[in-house]
Every structure is written in structure tokens, then in C-alpha cells.
Amino acid sequence: MLLFCPGCGNGLIVEEGQRCHRFACNTCPYVHNITRKVTNRKYPKLKEVDDVLGGAAAWENVDSTAESCPKCEHPRAYFMQLQTRSADEPMTTFYKCCNAQCGHRWRD
């Protein structure tokens, strides 16, 4: 846990005092004795993950091809091509199974 000095705003360090441990500031003379166990937990709020392929809307108007799904063996798959690397590299082809119950995604 990191506490800050109320006087100057710098981080406080823990040092051993005469009677107990204490929070002390290296910049100014602020000192606060620690008389009990200090705990504090804060869990950060997680961001929603953005689908880098554009989510479900990206697959609405794409073509399908005769590519077999590796998961369910369905004979057709939707596909789209994106440039994921530098311009001198070939485009990456992304597939999505046409079987509505499967919907498996993979890339070539």
C-alpha cells in the first residue's frame, strides 16, 4: 500500500520509531505513528475488451467460401482479409464457420 504525505504529496516510507513503526516523509518533517495494522484493498475496474475484428457487425456482409471448419467439419465458412502486418507481408485471412451452432473462428 502506498500512502502520500499530506504536506508535500511525496510517497511515505515506513521506518522504525522509538515506540512503534511509523510513516515518514523524506522531504518534509511529517511523521505518523502506526498504532494498528493498516490494510486497504482496491480492485481496479476492468475495461470491456474490444473485439479487434469489429465484433459481430464485421461479419454481417462478408462472403463465404468452401473452407472446412476444423471444429465441426462444416463445409463452408465466412471469410475476410485484413492487413495485420507490414505492407510487404501477405494479408491475413480470418474465417468463421457458417454453421450457426458452431461459429468457430480461425485464421489462415
Swiss-Prot record:
UniProt-annotated binding residues for Zn(2+) 2: C69, C72, C98, C102
Protein's UniProt keywords contain Nucleotide-binding: no
Biological processes annotated in GO: defense response to virus; innate immune response; transcription by RNA polymerase III
Principal place of residence: nucleus
Sequence motif Hairpin, location on chain: 88-89
SUPFAM superfamilies: Zinc beta-ribbon (SSF57783)
Source taxon at top rank: Eukaryota
Ligand binding (Zn(2+) 1): C5, C8, C25, C28
UniProt keyword terms in alphabetical order: Antiviral defense, Disease variant, DNA-directed RNA polymerase, Immunity, Innate immunity, Leukodystrophy, Metal-binding, Neurodegeneration, Nucleus, Transcription, Zinc, Zinc-finger
Keyword Zinc-finger: yes
One Gene Ontology MF term: DNA-directed RNA polymerase activity
Subcellular compartments: Nucleus
Functional summary from the UniProt entry: Core component of RNA polymerase III (Pol III) which synthesizes small non-coding RNAs using the four ribonucleoside triphosphates as substrates. Can mediate Pol I proofreading of the nascent RNA transcript. Anchors into the Pol III active site to constantly monitor transcription fidelity, cleaves mis-incorporated 5'-ribonucleotides and restarts the transcription process. Once Pol III reaches the poly(dT) termination signal, can induce Pol III clamp opening and transcription termination.
Family designation: Belongs to the archaeal RpoM/eukaryotic RPA12/RPB9/RPC11 RNA polymerase family.
Identification of the protein by name: DNA-directed RNA polymerase III subunit RPC10
Organism annotation: Homo sapiens (Human)
